[in-house]
From Swiss-Prot:
It comes from the Eukaryota. It is found in: Cytoplasm, Cytoskeleton. Keywords: Cytoplasm, Cytoskeleton, Dynein, Microtubule, Motor protein. Gene3D superfamilies: Protein Inhibitor Of Neuronal Nitric Oxide Synthase. Disulfide bonds: none annotated. This is Probable dynein light chain 2, cytoplasmic. One of its GO terms (cellular component) is cytoplasmic dynein complex. Acts as one of several non-catalytic accessory components of a dynein complex.
Length: 90
């Protein structure tokens, strides 16, 4: 099965971290079909890889306004699902 196209809509992450996050999102969507399960998997993996505290929002349509640590934000679309990921808090 070919990988779905990832569309990065907005990010301020460095390339290596961005690439790791995209890899984790792809793995989550391969393993799970429910948005909340995708979000939980991504959050747990990023907390392990990069330290706490990551927040993940998944869905086809949502609005948002968040505060985050500079260099730790990405909004992407994968498999027709929008995924917002950011780090905030300790």
């Amino acid at each position: 099965m070919s990988e779905e196209k990832i569309e990065v809509k907005e990010t301020d992450m460095e390339d290596p971290q961005r690439d790791m996050v995209i890899s984790v999102v792809r793995e989550a969507q391969r393993l799970y079909n429910i948005d909340k399960d995708v979000a939980a998997f991504v959050k747990e993996e990023l907390d392990k890889k990069f330290g706490a505290t990551w927040h993940v929002i998944c869905g086809k349509c949502f609005g948002s306004r968040v505060s985050y640590e500079m260099g730790h934000f990405i909004l992407l679309k994968c498999n027709k699902v929008n995924v917002m990921i950011y780090k905030c808090g300790y």
